[in-house]
Amino acid sequence: MKNPCNVIAIIGKPRDQQAIQTHRELYEWLTSEGYQVFIDDRLAAILDEIPQSQFASLVELGKNADLAIVVGGDGNMLGAARILSRFDVAVIGVNRGNLGFLTDLNPDDFKEALKAVLKGKYIEEERFLLEAEIHRHGQIKSHNAALNEAVLHPGQVAHMIEFEVYIDDSFAFSLRADGLIVSTPTGSTAYSLSGGGPILSPSLNAISLVPMFPHTLSSRPLVVDGKRRIKLIVSPENRGTQEVSCDGQVSLPVSPGDEIHIYQSPNVLKLIHPKDYSYYHVLRNKLGWSSKLF
């Protein structure tokens, strides 16, 4: 994070009154502390008591802010991350969602933790994203980024699809399955975990491939080096349309015969945590693991 931190962005979608109140409290407290504060312009109509000059788009916030505070759950963080990762801005989260693997701060007691962060007492880590491209007849038809995962799956009707998997242009395996989850370490505690994938430490430079309901007894999740390029070739015999879903928020249409290229993005999310942050404490707390015996 840039030091000193002068410009702070508050980001989040209109969700419920408690979340809106947290945006309001953050703005009032940070401005009283002397910081220049701007807010996600999606909140302009709701926070109408705040001057319109203090609202800006996510791109503008990413360009100008030293620190971005995302209010909400992991979904809000994922949506913000795909844009903020393009810029040199640190990001921290206030949890107003459910599990909150990426949003550390308690909404009812954020001031002390934020004071320490703003004084330079924090842990910073970089989380890599994936880029997903749909290739058709040698041309890129669509693309997007994902912090958690890129998922190949059928369109609106659930059915089995066939595809081949290549790693660095070397054939790895073919599958008849409901799809494939290609996950980052950040996403290994999300959809990938539900599909039986491994939990990867966030600092690992690795990508996991998790088949979804494969029609075989031998298929298992596979972990590959994070610098490998994944190519999926969709069978031209598949019926209907398929999709690639990025973080469960953006869908890229896929036609039979298309190629899907998935690789590590050059952009990273600069995620910061309070000094007392422990990834394994988060896992134990969120996943309900047993406590120490002695």
From Swiss-Prot:
Q: Which Pfam family, giving just one, matches this sequence?
A: NAD_kinase
Instruction: Supply the InterPro entries for this chain.
Output: ATP-NAD_kinase_N (IPR017438), ATP-NAD_kinase_PpnK-typ_C (IPR017437), NAD/diacylglycerol_kinase_sf (IPR016064), NADK (IPR002504)
Reactions mediated catalytically = NAD(+) + ATP = ADP + NADP(+) + H(+)
Q: What is its EC number?
A: 2.7.1.23
The keyword Acyltransferase belongs to this UniProt entry's keyword annotation: no
Cellular compartment(s): Cytoplasm
Give the main EC class: transferase
Q: What keywords were assigned to this record?
A: ATP-binding, Cytoplasm, Kinase, NAD, NADP, Nucleotide-binding, Transferase
Kinase recorded as keyword:
yes
Cellular component, GO annotation: cytoplasm
Task: State the Gene Ontology BP annotations.
Answer: NAD metabolic process; NADP biosynthetic process
Cofactor(s) essential for the protein: a divalent metal cation
Q: Which residues bind NAD(+)?
A: 74-75, 148-149, 159, 176, 178, 189-194, 249
Q: Which residues form the active site?
A: 74 (proton acceptor)
GO MF terms, alphabetically ordered: ATP binding; metal ion binding; NAD binding; NAD+ kinase activity
Role noted for this protein: Involved in the regulation of the intracellular balance of NAD and NADP, and is a key enzyme in the biosynthesis of NADP. Catalyzes specifically the phosphorylation on 2'-hydroxyl of the adenosine moiety of NAD to yield NADP.
The similarity comment for this entry is: Belongs to the NAD kinase family.
Q: What is this protein called?
A: NAD kinase
The organism is: Vibrio campbellii (strain ATCC BAA-1116)
Kindly list the organism's lineage. Answer: Bacteria, Pseudomonadati, Pseudomonadota, Gammaproteobacteria, Vibrionales
